[in-house]
Amino acid sequence: MERWLQLHVWSKDQQDQDQEHLLDEKIPINRAWMDFLQMSPFLKRKLVTLLETVAKLRTSTVVYPGEERVFSWSWLCEPTQVKVIILGQDPYHGGQATGLAFSVSKTDPVPPSLRNIFLEVSACDSQFAVPLHGCLNNWARQGVLLLNTILTVEKGKPGSHSDLGWIWFTNYIISCLSNQLDHCVFMLWGSKAIEKASLINTNKHLVLKSQHPSPLAARSNRPSLWPKFLGCGHFKQANEYLELHGKCPVDWNLD
């Protein structure tokens, strides 16, 4: 009997473990996030297939961000430290993408949407010094998860990877954050981000909604259910909520 178990049960278990380990090696996400997400082998295979699709596209088109930066959000921000989640759409398609939503490197000009974000932080925090660069790494290191809902894009074609399969993965991340953490602040700017509100448990998290910070949205006179981004007060509300629940507020300064 023991021999039969060894051949037909234990050996299969070992094979399954080996296969799952191989899948893990193909997913360049911080191990802390892999442990946190607890993806099934099926979901891991699904993600690996998506990564292989993106890798194939890179052979014939320019894809942003670079392969090594797609999951940089996972390396700058540990899952158990997350306290604010800011959702973006897809990465910058002009070459500035860093893997963090809205962020650019210190050598790139600050994009218009990020300039408006800085204006709103200034209105919320008198101690905020408007930076000359748009690198948001300091926010990420404090537990601000800057997550695009689509993690790659073709050069010059916004939204070009929206149907590749990223949305199921980032929805899964949002759901895990909502389920496993307590008293986080989710900032949802624009209709695409606001669609994610249904994934978040509002009984234990604060969900803040506004129009998108882009200048186009700021100038628009179209009726909206949501307030304009400029004047929304999200950064002040976020820190007040964090302090109310015994968490350190975010220092929004970048330098």
Swiss-Prot record:
GO cellular component: host cell nucleus
Record keywords, A-Z: DNA damage, DNA repair, Host nucleus, Hydrolase
InterPro entries: UDG_fam1, Ura-DNA_Glyclase_AS, Uracil-DNA_glycosylase-like, Uracil-DNA_glycosylase-like_sf
Calcium keyword on record: no
Catalytic reactions on record: Hydrolyzes single-stranded DNA or mismatched double-stranded DNA and polynucleotides, releasing free uracil
Function: Excises uracil residues from the DNA which can arise as a result of misincorporation of dUMP residues by DNA polymerase or deamination of cytosines. Therefore may reduce deleterious uracil incorporation into the viral genome, particularly in terminally differentiated cells which lack DNA repair enzymes.
Family to which this protein belongs: Belongs to the uracil-DNA glycosylase (UDG) superfamily. UNG family.
Protein name per its UniProtKB record: Uracil-DNA glycosylase
Organism whose genome encodes this protein: Equine herpesvirus 2 (strain 86/87)
